[in-house]
């Protein structure tokens, strides 16, 4: 908002007042440069993730990522690729039970869609995302279906010691269009 306002100010004034618009332009540029992009984006149901790789681009993983969701993630990131671009899924290793993608730091982010994959990923990954309830003995940092039911979609920012999490719906927020959804039991996913 600052950048366009400054440009309009510079354009419409013909007196020395026009130079006041430079302050808005500078503020807009500084604000744009200070925007930190998330390292991991988690869909509201935990069936799809986007992970920022070493090249600075997002890699999409998971079978639950609709073209609409992927398009929104890419646009919010300033990425002009199309959802059907094969390069979007190039850094992920996926099968019907889940996916594994590496962050720029080399950490492994796992998306576990089945109980069997969740148990294995809890041992091997640094971060596990799952629509299921995480087991108590999971050694990895985990985002599970119980948390996602309360928060909706998430953005995660790696800070060296863990992740700073930004929720699309703060815990406790309830609106008619954003009711808490039931989490399927692990056996419901395994039957798919």
Segments the model singles out, each with a brief description of its role:
Residues 1-54:
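Transmembrane helix-bundle segments that form internal channels/tunnels in multi-pass membrane proteins
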Residues 52-192:
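Extracytosolic and intramembrane catalytic regions of membrane-associated proteins
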């Amino acid at each position: 908002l600052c950048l366009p306002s400054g440009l309009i100010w510079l354009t419409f004034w013909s007196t020395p007042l026009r130079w006041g618009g430079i302050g808005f332009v500078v503020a807009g540029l500084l604000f744009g440069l200070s925007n930190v992009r998330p390292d991991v984006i988690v869909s509201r149901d935990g069936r799809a993730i986007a992970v920022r790789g070493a090249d600075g681009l997002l890699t999409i993983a998971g079978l639950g990522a609709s073209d609409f969701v992927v398009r929104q993630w890419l646009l919010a990131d300033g990425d002009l690729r199309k959802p059907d671009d094969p390069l979007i899924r190039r850094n992920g290793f996926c099968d019907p039970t889940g996916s594994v993608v590496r962050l720029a730091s080399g950490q492994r982010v796992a998306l576990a869609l089945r109980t069997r994959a969740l148990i294995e990923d809890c041992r091997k990954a640094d971060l596990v995302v799952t629509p299921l309830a995480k087991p108590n003995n999971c050694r990895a940092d985990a985002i599970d279906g119980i948390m996602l039911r309360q928060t909706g979609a998430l953005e995660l920012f790696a800070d060296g010691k863990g992740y700073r999490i930004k929720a699309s719906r703060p815990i406790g927020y309830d609106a008619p269009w954003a009711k808490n959804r039931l989490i399927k039991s692990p056996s419901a996913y395994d039957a798919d």
